[in-house]
A protein has these predicted regions:
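Polybasic "coupling" helices that flank or enter modular domains
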Residues: 118-189
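Cyclic nucleotide-binding regulatory domains
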Residues: 14, 39-102
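Phosphate-/nucleic-acid-contacting segments
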Residues: 158, 162-229
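Cyclic nucleotide-binding regulatory module and flanking cytosolic helices
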Residues: 1-40, 81, 86-87
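A residue-level structural signature of the nucleotidyltransferase/glycosyltransferase Rossmann-like core
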Residues: 51, 73, 105-106, 176, ...
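Cyclic-nucleotide recognition modules
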Residues: 22-23, 74-136
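Residues that scaffold the ATP/ADP-binding catalytic core of kinase and kinase-like folds
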Residues: 62, 84-85, 115-116, 158, ...
Length: 229
């Protein structure tokens, strides 16, 4: 892992809605590190050390049950803050954060973040906005998981969500599917075998096409027709 100061271009991308003074304050408190694939930033039930700001790459947030099963809550990309709720509340991290690919991540210690929030209403509002976004995202994901009647509907919801996230608003589009069938199963609460069977069925019905890691959805409305709730 290589540690270095925050790259200004990444700062503009991640902290672009903050004033120059607020960005500078955060930069001075942050240590940025390049992590390899599979690095654990923090673990579920671990005492909070600080927050992690994803500058580049992708990070998986997951929780584990007593039976050993894993549920992926979401995949985080550049611009998101991880661990803020635990740091502010002084409670254990509620999930495990693991890099999905080589990633550049900034770390700000708990004491430094709280100090910055007390001293700057702008930074406090910025953190609060991220917490609100996380809450809304969690509610939406719980709704999708609980109100879907079948694994097929959950998979359709997930793929339509990928289109929305990528900004594809047309009736057809393509996205990068950088998850294994096992990881997709962990996102929708089913087995790898079920995911493989469903994807094969979707292809047979021409609901999706796949070229390597590129997922093509030729008819969004056809895929959405599987979503009942």
């Amino acid at each position: 892992m290589a540690a270095h100061v925050i790259d200004q271009r990444n700062a503009e991308k991640t902290l672009g809605n903050l004033s120059a003074a607020a960005v500078e304050a955060l930069e001075q408190a942050a240590l940025t590190t390049t992590y390899p694939t599979g690095a654990v930033l923090f673990a579920e039930s671990q005492a909070p050390r600080g927050v992690f700001i994803v500058r580049r790459g992708r990070v998986k947030l997951s929780v584990s049950g007593s039976d050993g099963r894993t549920l992926i809550l979401r995949i985080v990309e550049g611009g998101d803050i991880l661990g803020a709720a635990s740091v502010i509340a002084g409670r254990e991290y509620e999930a495990t954060a693991e890099t999905q690919e080589p990633s550049e991540v900034s770390f700000i210690r708990q004491s430094d973040l709280l100090r910055l929030m007390r001293g700057s209403g702008e930074i406090a509002l910025w953190v609060t906005q991220h917490l609100s976004s996380d809450y809304n995202c969690t509610c939406r994901e719980i709704r999708d998981l609980m109100l879907s009647d079948s694994a097929g509907e959950k998979l359709a919801r997930l793929m339509v969500g990928w289109l929305d996230h990528s900004g594809e608003t047309k009736q057809s589009g393509q996205v990068k599917m950088a998850l294994t069938h096992e990881e997709i199963g962990q996102m929708i609460g089913t087995s790898r075998e079920t995911v493989s069977r469903l994807i094969a069925g979707f292809k047979k019905q021409n609901l999706i096409q796949q070229n390597g890691a590129t997922l093509v959805i030729p008819n969004r409305m056809a895929l959405e027709s599987l979503i009942t709730a």
